[in-house]
Amino acid sequence: MHPVLRLSEDFLTDRGAVSFPALPRMFFMVRGAAMFGTRSLGPDEVWYSEDAVTVRAAESGATIWRWDLSLGAPAPWRNGPGVITREKLSVPLENLPAGDLLWRGDSVAFPPGGVAYLHRHQGPGIRCVVEGELRVDTNGHSQSHKVGRSWFEAGPDPVFAQAGDKPTRFVRVMILPRSLIGKSSIQYVNDEDRAKPKSQQYRVFVDTPLTLAGA
């Protein structure tokens, strides 16, 4: 059975609360504020844990993007009052890197018109646009992703990306070889692109060893 990476969106009204069972999981705060156990998070902040956690929204409510990794269907949980969950994307990871693994959660920002030259990554992942619009070209197909749109990249397939006419940013989770802790996973396809100035900027939220025992 292949591990499954899921991205869901949780909407919590004021004082809405939900308890999640133990799984490798990253929460990204889109709007509002919430308590993750005893820690308070606001917009653009992240919580990662493999342990069970209870999330409680502040009076402003909260919109949260949540990445989970599980072996098949995750353990069931029940949303409390004032909580609505919508699954955005779910993908079996059929070609995970061999050996020890790494969970990386980060964001990638582009100036208007900025590009990511044709490249690969060393593991699979799910992305979601939080600001602007990004065109992604891969395997002969081109798609434009606006705010809230998510997509999957397997890793080995070459990808070219270009931002629209506004600043653009997406958040992603990738499952990578553990040897890449603290290192970039990007591999440029064309030699001439390696030395070119790069317009994208990275912000790493989570870069930690991953075990599938709890999944």
Label the model's feature ranges:
Residues 17-21, 38, 116-121, 161-164:
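Short histidine-centered beta-strand/loop micro-motifs
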Residues 22-35, 110, 121-136, 173-177:
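Short, conserved beta-strand element in jelly-roll/cupin
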Residues 98-148:
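A contiguous binding-surface segment within folded domains or other stable secondary-structure elements
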Residues 1-24:
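Short Lys/Arg-enriched alpha/beta "domain-start" segment
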Residues 40, 50-81, 155-183:
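Ligand-binding loop in jelly-roll beta-barrel domains
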Residues 65-115:
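Surface-exposed beta-loop interaction hotspot
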Residues 184-215:
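Acidic/histidine-enriched, glycine/proline-rich intrinsically disordered or flexible terminal extensions
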Residues 9-14, 26, 33-55, 110, ...:
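Short acidic-glycine-tyrosine-enriched beta hairpin
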